[in-house]
Swiss-Prot record:
Designated gene of the protein: purA
Record family assignment: Belongs to the adenylosuccinate synthetase family.
Residues binding IMP: D13, E14, G15, K16, N38, A39, G40, H41, T128, R142, Q223, T238, R302
GO biological process: 'de novo' AMP biosynthetic process; IMP metabolic process
PROSITE patterns in the record: ADENYLOSUCCIN_SYN_1, ADENYLOSUCCIN_SYN_2
Organism: Desulfitobacterium hafniense (strain Y51)
Descriptive protein name: Adenylosuccinate synthetase
UniProt binding sites for Mg(2+): D13, G40
């Protein structure tokens, strides 16, 4: 038995898709355990770029079983569009399974998401308006529609009718918009049910049997540590649990079955949407990072905010997820900078703190305390061994290891599978 949880350690967009794709080669089962189509993964395989939002990145390996776990909220329309996209790209998807316990994103979830975000005015939290939050709200309220309900005509009809009455009251009386039509939604979603029925499974059982058989299981997280509902920069967070603990509840597996936790972390920092960002660079340096790193969201196309590496965030991610290894991404983007800065603390109210603050009020007031190190000018996109990196790049990696007390096991020097420096085995 070997199982690895792969998580994002910053605000998402760290490059998890590439690392999942890289590790999936040795895995037998790849499991997505939280989030929805608000997440985006970009994977480059055999020179081709694939953009995925819901289906695990391991789908690009035909012999791997991929599972959408119970912790995921599924928009069936998006799922079928993604399956069609992969089919057009000649990718076989016959080994995809969907948890019967996963919750379904409904049209009223998407509509309410947009209306609620727009009503916040200057207090927007940066939602993607894809219905993720409202779907998780219904899950918590115990009125959600699960995949198992969707494929049961009687259950689906009853739950949809009950929910739609409540949602239409909200839409008409609070937001002043037209109500949604029951028959139209029922017909549309019944059609989806027929198409996905053969993919539905008891995913927890599938994972359990795989582990008992000694197979290798990779749990793929979406978003990142600082977007976690409990441990992120609340309220600028997602509605699920991207940290390692989320894999247990979102996939139906006990914590003693997890062997390693790999934290995916960029060699610099990015953030999409609202909220504090101490190392943000609103200047030419930040713009250079954005252009060199192609920092535009896979899901939204929004330009990502860019800044220097923040060791405070990295240490915090290690603490809340028990990270055993880092996968350091986009080291090549830093080539050409004469000096590189690392945030090693925060200055707030004339005091320097060295732990990530819980209060957003304090976090917003934080100014970065930087350590400046030498940069490198060489193109490193073709380097395959750590010892062949420029000394300054090696020193940068080692300094991150020192500051986080965590080994950097994988280093990405480009988007391709082959552009990965391996310093130790994960599986």
């Amino acid at each position: 038995m070997a199982s690895v949880v792969l998580i994002g350690t910053q605000w998402g967009d760290e490059g998890k898709g590439k690392v999942t794709d890289f590790l999936a080669e040795k895995a037998d089962l790849v499991v997505r355990y939280q989030g929805g189509n608000n997440a985006g993964h970009t994977v480059v395989a055999k020179g081709e770029e694939f953009k995925l939002h819901l289906i695990p990145s391991g789908i690009l390996y035909e012999d791997k079983t991929c599972v959408i776990g119970n912790g995921v909220v599924v928009d069936p329309k998006v799922l079928l569009e993604e399956l069609a996209y992969l089919s057009e790209r000649k990718v076989k998807t016959g080994k995809l399974l969907i948890s019967s316990n996963a919750h379904v994103i409904m049209p009223y979830h998407r509509l309410l998401d947009a209306l609620e975000e727009d009503s916040r005015g200057e207090h927007k939290i940066g939602t993607t308006k894809r219905g993720i939050g409202p779907a998780y709200m219904d899950k918590t309220l115990r009125i959600g529609i699960r995949i198992m309900d969707l494929i049961d005509d009687e259950e689906f009809a009853a739950k949809l009718r009950r929910n739609l009455q409540e949602k239409n009251n909200l839409l008409t009386k609070v937001y002043g918009v037209e109500p949604l039509d029951y028959d139209a939604i029922y017909q549309e979603y019944s059609g989806y049910a027929q198409k996905i029925r053969g993919l539905v499974a008891d995913s927890s059982l599938v994972i359990d049997e795989s582990l008992k058989a000694g197979e290798k299981v990779l749990f793929e997280g979406a978003q990142g540590t600082l977007l976690d509902l409990d441990h992120g920069t609340y309220p600028y967070v997602t509605s699920s649990h991207p940290i390692a603990g989320g894999a247990c509840t979102g996939a139906g597996v006990g914590p003693t079955r997890i062997n390693r936790v790999v934290g995916v972390i960029k060699a610099y920092t990015t953030r999409v949407g609202e909220g504090p960002f101490p190392t943000e660079l609103a200047d030419e340096t930040g713009e250079l990072m954005r252009q060199n790193g192609h920092e535009f969201g896979t899901t939204t196309g929004r330009a990502r905010r860019c800044g220097w590496f923040d060791a405070m965030i990295a240490r915090y991610a290690v603490r809340v997820s028990g990270i055993s290894d880092f996968a350091l991404m986009k080291l090549d983007v830093l080539s050409g900078f004469e000096k590189i800065k690392i945030c090693v603390g925060y200055r707030v109210n004339n005091e320097v703190i060295y732990e990530f603050p819980q209060s957003q009020k304090i976090f917003k007031a934080c100014e970065p305390v930087y350590e400046v190190i030498e940069g490198w000018q060489e193109d490193i996109t073709g380097v395959t061994h750590f010892e062949d990196l420029p000394k300054a790049a090696q020193d940068y990696v080692r300094r991150i290891e020192q500051l986080t007390e965590t080994q950097v096991t994988l280093i990405a020097v480009g988007p391709g599978r082959e552009q990965t420096i391996v310093r130790g085995e994960i599986f």
